[in-house]
Amino acid sequence: MAVSCRLLVVSLSFFLPTVLAPSLPAQQHTDTSGQYPAELLSGLHWRDVGPMRGGRTYAVAGNADQPDTFYMGSVGGGVWKTENAGRTWFPIADEGIPIGSIGAIAVAPSDPNVIYVGTGEPDIRSQHSYGIGVFKSTDAGKTWKHIGLEETRQIGRIVVDPKNPNRVYVAALGHVYKANPERGIYRSTDGGAHWKKVLFKANDPENVGAVDLAIDPKDPRVLYASLWATRRPPWSVYAPSNMAGGGLYKSTDGGDTWKQLAGGLPTDDFVGKIGVAVAPSNPNRVWAVVDDLGAAVARPIRGGPPAAGREHETGGGVYVSDDAGATWQRVNSEQRLWSRGWYFESIAVDPVNPDRAYVINTATYMTTDGGKTFVPVKGAPGGDDYHQLWVNPKDGNRMVLSSDQGTVISVDGAKTWSTWYNQPTAQIYHVAADNRFPYWLYGAQQDSGGVGVSTWSRQGVLSFRNWEPTCLAGESNTVVPDPKDGNILYGGGDGRCDQALNLPAPLGGELPAADPNDPARRTWTLPQVFSLADEALYYSNQFVFRSRDRGRSWEKISPDLARLHPEVPKTLDAATAKDIDQPMTDRFGVVYSIGPSPIDAKTVWVGTDDGLIHVTRDDGANWKEVTPPAMTAWSKVSQIEASHFDVETAYASIDRHRLADNMPYIYRTHDGGKTWQNVVKGIPEGAFVNSVKEDPKQKGLLYAATELRVYVSFNDGDQWQPLQNNMPVTSVRDIVVHGDDLAIATYGRGFWLMDQMTALRQLAVKGSQIESEAAYLFVPGETYAIHNGSMNGTPLPHEEAQELNPPAGVLAYYWLKSAPSQPIKLELIDASGAAKACVASDTPVKPVDTEAINVQAIWEQPTLPPSASTGMHRIALNVVPPRGFGRRGPVTPPPADACHPAGSLPPAQEESQARRGRGGPAGLQPGEYTVRLTVDGKTYTQPVTIHPDPRNLSQGADAALGGEDDDL
């Protein structure tokens, strides 16, 4: 088939009863004085650029009466739903649940419209996010209401009485980093209007929480609940601590009274997490998977099983009771089923066969002989790490399974599974951009490894074709492209490789050997960064290293910059605090962030994860500590940013959530670190800061990546306001400014990109003036004429996971202080004064005539005219319309040209105009243009240059370029 090539203009760049009433999320309270109105930023738009690869999920549920309907809760990406057994997924709580971390989902069996969601994941790895209580929907996820338990923080399970949707139980784990009383099993009998704590550890209520629950489907007065005492010190990288107090409990009166179960179960001080399930076909059969390493086991500091060859007695394994929990037998002690229990320990039972059960670990294991033997039914060589399985109580062949790679569904009894390559819920730690055109974004995805995504696709949409795993970097390291060759990638601690060839690029040298008395330390993520001043490459552990030959050789340029004897936080319990006396010694800190000065190659700022800031002014020969006095040990310097305009200025984002402090902290210095100010007005509690970046082109314009959303400051941090707009609430981990684009890495929704954010720069210069104007046209950003090859072959089915290309055309932003009395018009004028493109707000939108087309209506979506409502808006001006087909639908040719209505041109020109609207003749050529906005008879203009495609040196000289009959 002939493949047309059109020229498009694209802008890239838990017996004391406690009654609790619902409370509101605290993070809603903050000082917003001095902010610009949200309408002044409303036209700025975020674009999801993938990758189309699922991220870590924990909570899953289904609707027994609608067998193709399932729900999943991403640990950072919110609540999602499928109505076609996993063929496609869509988010259902982005506007109803203001937190991305989901720990539990339960659908009421007697009324599937009632859904309860518990926020805050219970798999409390070192990188996790908190919750803000329980939410409820009564319309199958369309709308949501917060119903309390905000301070429970992490919720492991919710169960609903099978006969009464208003009787619900919640297993609350509590705060991870401090003691708090909101732990245990909570019950509501009025649908969440009020809560009563019905199970907790009376002798230690502030440290022992609840993590799992099971209900007898035939007698809902019978419940089983597991208690778990756990905590994390701020230096912990892997397993959390286990404290005394855990165990399995049973109630036979709907939660009024409870009894601890023993009769063969471990009851020592080393009992960890326990998963429990009741066989629906025989409720006397109860299953449990128990984490218990035993008193004789020496626990390594990083967690995991005991050292090889060490004699020990453990209580871990799979247990079965055939008398409703009175007595238990350990039927299987294989460590593959229960090891690393803090991260797993979940079990599910077939609804018909009580001997058929599933245990969840690095693989999903099935037994059909009552637990004697298990075989994996889902798992890959890398160890996918699975978490929860929901089995349809009316059809045991249908199930939904969560994992570190996303959520999958089986409709044939675990023989085959749906894909997780249709869930844009990746957890990305950092973001970097290369200098190719179009450019790529890079980062490390938790549990899946390094990933690169293209920000533009010649197919018109971003799909599986436009991202790829990187040739290096594990799940947590930085991925940094070479500034001169985007194919060469560097992975923090992993070396260097050629992405195009998928081959390692020899380094020729290694990091200098560590001092045997001070061995190299590391944490989950370590920084690696190129200096913008001289392209030196920096890397760190407790030392800072530099390479001037792109990693072929390295020199250590600092002493150990972490604290010598960091204090133990007062928020820790005594047992967890002892963790600091491990054989590794009390040295845990590392240099967590590096900020080379973009304007002085000899100046480098660094911050540690245990709360210190240093700076060198002489290439690393000498280092000076310049830590703000208010900072204490274990205040993690999550990012330090050297100013692009002043060598004495730097910004440091400080994360203290590991000290149970969720307040935001951004320190600013203008005198080389002598004095610091905490500049966070406008950022609420809960939004602790993961990164702060300065705009490289506009002094005083700052961006902050927080645990809840992105914030922007137009006045050097004195005042902040949300830059959320259409982006869902999620943990934002990193930011990079690339040309005129703003890219972020999120911990639950992958990479997001704001195309052409130049309006932010203009607001930083004269925002108050713009706000006061009746209308204002912003200066467009850099724009390029690029070839957009149409589909080569049939388009991807719309069910395939896809996201949109950047808008095609000159991206015009405009502000209307109030709605004008007349229609507005925007034009693109060439150097001769001719209008090459024009759109008007009164252009009627012609609905798709489904009786006259030969494709589904999803393939023919009308283009909307520019808005004339109050606020900031954007519109893409282009002669040739985009021809992309995305999940949100494509766009058809634009409406009748507002500059030249039908019938106003000579016949030949009329035909040409019509053909052009169908993607006909040549699009906009490179050159100088003017954007003109007309509002109530007044015109506003701004210049724009359309640059040639950097990949096409002959562009501009070829007059026929972009013709409708061009073939490839």
Segments (PLM) and residue ranges:
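Boundary at the C-terminal end of the N-terminal hydrophobic targeting segment
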Residues: 22-26
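Beta-propeller blade termini and top-face loops
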Residues: 27-800, 807-813, 841-844, 851-853
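Glycine-centered tight-turn motifs at strand-turn-strand junctions
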Residues: 835-922
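Extended, polar beta-sheet/loop recognition surfaces of beta-rich domains
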Residues: 768-795, 936-968
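Beta-strand-rich binding/interaction modules
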Residues: 812-813, 820-839, 928-932
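Bacterial N-terminal signal peptides
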Residues: 8-21
